Amino acid sequence: MKAKYGVALAIGSFALGVAAIQTLHAQAKPSVYMVAEINVRDKAGYEKDFLPPVLKNIKENGGTYLAGGFDKAQAWSGLPVANRYVILKFDSMDHAKAFYNDKQREFERTVGGKYADFRIIAVEGGEMK
């Protein structure tokens, strides 16, 4: 009788462990890094009209500013660099997409487009293979 309980307990513990591992693995989504390559033509207008609402949107969607600024990048090979780069970090691609939604793209096109040209790239983090 004790052996049956021992086997049942072992099977139950194994199943619980498998379920816990699957749950933890499913929650481990990679961070997403968003790189903005921006050629600003009118710095004063960009900083006054465009930047404040964008910074608010980044914060509201869980973004973290990692690096960037005006004239901070150096080209080591390839094409010349833009005059402004920004690197943001989001917890997941879903958070990055929530930030860079239709409303943000429209604002970038209509307001930001008066002052700058943009290229935005999102990259999932992960291990190099």
Where are these regions (language model features)?
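Secondary-structure boundary/capping signal
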Residues: 62-65, 104, 116-120
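Bacterial N-terminal signal peptides that target proteins for export
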Residues: 1-11
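A common structural junction motif
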Residues: 104-110
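Short, flexible helix/strand-to-coil boundary loops that buttress conserved ligand/catalytic motifs
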Residues: 50, 100, 112
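Short S/T/G/P-rich N-terminal loop/turn motif that feeds into the first structured element of a domain
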Residues: 16-97, 124-129
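C-terminal end-helix/capping segment
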Residues: 110-129
